[in-house]
């Protein structure tokens, strides 16, 4: 059974031909023709999520793991606007998301008809392409071209696209067969390594005594990992890897803030690189950003397949290619240089690690101690999803097992869809997925649990410090008389939500109970699990601030 409407058939046929394998559908009437068609297509998996914001982040989590476009489908009106947070995240995180919205015909917009808004180009500031279709036989070729271009861009450029599909009534008429349509191939410019002057870059690199490579959000890549081994062998190269980089090396600095906190001006000058190479997504560490803005390298090269990012206001070279392609070609033009740059700072790193371990031995029960316990307990070869705000910042202070793949919504750094993203990732990746989140982030996206596709091996660890802990850590909020509006203190727990959504629920409130509850937490179960850990909100910030003083 398929929709009788030809425009709906064109959209469905295009998605099938462009290998869109998954469509997340939110209920509505105006999108009925597409819902009927997608749900009856034998090569397209359809998933139902009611809340559009949760649906979009759920789809984003699937696309994050599969590295393939995932479509989301909704009805007309404000339903579409609920997609925006996930679209912005996809835009800045280079995740392919195909947004398909049903709409009223143009003659019904802005005349007082129900459930209508101005949907055309509504995401124009955060979308790679917008296809505004017209339901009319004479526009069939135009519609096919726009749909084909949108899907091809989503596939080739890894980002969100929007297809707006207006339907007039009737909406529920069906036919038995789906017509196959042809879609013209749109010629898109491809990445061309021949345009990169490797010889010039090699000369600059080879003459520099201090080279730094800084890696942001990055999908696990075995080939890139091997290439980094070659650069780590050069004693004039210092590699900084964020928690979300999924790159591990014993000669890399993986806890950036731990190293550079409270360095003196003289030490910062010694750390300042001559050449800086950056690749990957957004950088979490504010301290490394501040350092590289205050002590700018002479040469900053940013590598990205799509867009340049001048994070430190000193970009000298945008290298538009994939990092793995750049480093594999660049190897032929570089020569290792003897320098004490790497060894000096690795020694410094090791000294900080010793102080880190010593501090943790005597630490009071707190967010900090909970992170040590939780991160150490995560099983090998699983996937770790981390929410934003203080949670990702605590995680950055620890070395996490190399076999664990780590993800976080750092495109826009919002707390709004972390739970739904983690659920989508857990659905797509059959590895056990562990999601560590703060209380505000969890409750903000608690509707994400209203999803029938959550696997039984999914685990959530909530660090509940009764409010926004980040606002006690960062300078500023504590100096005002409006603290409650920043930290938003509360007495909520996840216990009743867990029962309502069929999760097993556990709780802990001390070092001993955390250890006890973690013992069997990751074992096979029939239901997903939540472990809620309550920490003392009054002491967490002091313990963290004391930590940075102790490791100096």
Name every feature range the model reports, one short phrase each.
Residues 100, 107-117, 394-552:
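Thiamine diphosphate
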Residues 1-3, 292-390, 496, 506-552:
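Phosphate/pyrophosphate-binding active-site segments
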Residues 21-24, 45-47, 65-104, 272-280, ...:
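A short, small-residue-rich loop immediately preceding and capping a beta-strand
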Residues 8-13, 26-30, 34-35, 346-430:
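Active-site diphosphate/adenylate-binding microenvironment
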Residues 82, 215-301, 401-429, 443-447, ...:
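Glycine-rich, anion-gripping cofactor-binding loops and their flanking helix/strand elements
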Residues 2-82, 88:
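N-terminal cofactor/phosphate-binding cores enriched in small/glycine residues
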Residues 121, 160, 165-195, 518-552:
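Glycine/aspartate-rich loop-and-adjacent alpha/beta segment that forms the canonical ThDP
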Residues 101-150, 241-348, 452, 474-475:
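Glycine-rich, acidic loop regions that bind phosphate or pyrophosphate groups
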């Amino acid at each position: 059974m398929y929709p009788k409407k030809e425009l709906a058939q064109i959209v469905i046929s295009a998605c099938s031909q462009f290998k869109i394998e998954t469509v997340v559908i939110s209920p509505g009437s105006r999108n009925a023709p597409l819902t009927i068609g997608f749900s009856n297509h034998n090569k397209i998996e359809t998933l139902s999520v009611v809340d559009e914001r949760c649906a979009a982040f759920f789809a984003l989590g699937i696309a994050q793991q599969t590295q393939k476009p995932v479509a989301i489908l909704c009805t007309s009106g404000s339903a579409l606007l609920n997609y925006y947070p996930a679209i912005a995240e996809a835009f800045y995180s280079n995740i392919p998301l195909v947004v398909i919205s049903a709409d009223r015909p143009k003659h019904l917009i802005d005349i007082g008809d129900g459930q209508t808004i101005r949907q055309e180009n509504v995401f124009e500031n955060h979308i790679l392409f917008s296809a505004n279709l017209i339901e009319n036989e004479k526009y069939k070729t135009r519609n096919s071209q726009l749909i084909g271009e949108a899907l091809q861009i989503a596939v080739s450029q890894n980002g969100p696209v929007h297809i707006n599909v207006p339907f007039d009534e009737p909406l529920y008429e069906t036919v038995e067969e789906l017509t196959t349509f042809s879609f013209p191939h749109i010629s898109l410019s491809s990445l061309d390594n021949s345009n990169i002057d490797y010889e010039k870059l090699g000369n600059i690199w080879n003459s520099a005594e201090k080279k730094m490579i800084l890696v942001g959000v990055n999908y696990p890549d075995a080939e890139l990992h091997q290439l980094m081994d070659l650069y780590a062998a050069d004693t004039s190269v210092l590699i900084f890897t964020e928690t979300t980089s999924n790159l591990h090396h014993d000669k890399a600095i993986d806890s950036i803030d731990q190293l550079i906190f409270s360095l003196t001006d003289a030490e910062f000058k010694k750390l300042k690189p001559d050449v800086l190479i950056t690749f990957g997504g957004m950088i979490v560490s504010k301290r490394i950003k501040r350092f590289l803005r205050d002590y700018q390298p002479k040469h900053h090269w940013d590598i990205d397949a799509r867009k340049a990012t001048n994070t430190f206001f000193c970009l000298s070279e945008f290298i538009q290619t994939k990092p793995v392609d750049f480093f594999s070609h660049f190897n032929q033009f570089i020569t290792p240089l003897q320098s004490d740059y790497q060894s000096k700072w690795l020694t410094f790193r090791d000294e900080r690690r010793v102080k880190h371990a010593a501090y943790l031995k005597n630490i009071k029960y707190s967010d900090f101690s909970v992170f040590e316990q939780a991160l150490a307990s995560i099983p090998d070869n699983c996937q770790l999803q981390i929410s934003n705000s203080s949670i990702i910042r605590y995680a950055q202070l620890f070395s996490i097992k190399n076999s664990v793949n780590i993800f976080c919504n750092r495109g826009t750094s919002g707390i709004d869809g972390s739970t739904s993203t983690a659920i989508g990732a857990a659905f797509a990746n059959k590895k056990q997925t562990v999601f560590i989140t703060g209380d505000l982030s969890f409750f903000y996206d608690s509707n994400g649990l209203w999803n029938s596709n959550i696997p039984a091996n999914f685990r959530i660890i909530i660090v509940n410090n009764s409010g926004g802990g980040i606002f006690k850590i960062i300078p500023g909020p504590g100096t005002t008389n409006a603290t409650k509006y920043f930290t938003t203190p509360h007495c909520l727990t996840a216990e009743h939500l867990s029962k309502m959504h069929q999760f097993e629920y556990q709780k802990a409130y001390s070092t001993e109970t955390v250890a006890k509850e973690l013992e069997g937490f990751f074992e096979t179960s029939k239901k997903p699990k939540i472990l809620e850990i309550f920490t003392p909100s009054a002491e967490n910030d002091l313990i963290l601030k004391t930590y940075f003083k102790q490791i100096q």
